[in-house]
């Protein structure tokens, strides 16, 4: 974990100082606008790189009738830079699935060659601040 923290802190340090090196923009009024060198913004940018390019659907993770975008794992995936969807489509790269029999989403993901992973994959990716190896988080699908 210390190695992860060091890697993230070095990236944030580099991002803050890169922003400080950028000259301020000028508004039409002539006022200068300084670049955003706030470490919180740099942290958000670094976090959003973790799953950038991933398009994720969820199967048996979000309770039926609940708004998917309010589920903690959906929100975590978005904070990590993934695009979340309620259905498996042509661009789906991952389906995060709870254990159980295969659902239509799981079958569609497998047919399209998308990874079917457990919720632990998202949590591990968040902890490590990098995309976890999908091979270690294969969803426990019966049959």
Q: What is each of the regions a protein language model found here?
A:
Residues 1-49:
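Eukaryotic nuclear low-complexity, Arg/Ser/Gly/Pro-rich intrinsically disordered regions
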Residues 22-23, 27, 34, 98, ...:
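Intrinsic-disorder/low-complexity coil detector
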Residues 25-28, 47, 72-74, 108-111, ...:
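Generic preference for flexible, low-structure residues
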Residues 44-124:
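Interaction modules related to DNA damage response and DNA replication/repair
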Residues 116-143:
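Ser/Thr/Gly-rich flexible loops in soluble cytosolic domains mediating phosphotransfer, phosphorylation
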């Amino acid at each position: 974990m210390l190695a992860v923290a060091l890697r993230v802190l070095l990236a944030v340090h580099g991002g803050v100082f890169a922003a400080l090196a950028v000259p301020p923009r000028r508004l039409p009024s002539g006022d200068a606008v300084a670049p955003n060198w706030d470490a919180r913004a740099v942290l958000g940018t670094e976090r959003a790189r973790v799953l950038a390019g991933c398009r994720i659907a969820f199967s048996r993770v979000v309770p039926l009738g609940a708004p998917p975008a309010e589920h903690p794992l959906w929100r975590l995936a978005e904070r990590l830079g993934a695009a979340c969807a309620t259905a498996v489509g042509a661009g789906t790269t991952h389906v995060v699935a709870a254990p159980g029999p295969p659902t239509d989403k799981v079958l569609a993901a497998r047919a399209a060659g998308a990874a079917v992973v457990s919720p632990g994959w998202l949590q591990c990716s968040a902890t490590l601040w990098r995309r976890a190896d999908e091979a270690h988080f294969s969803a426990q699908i019966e049959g």
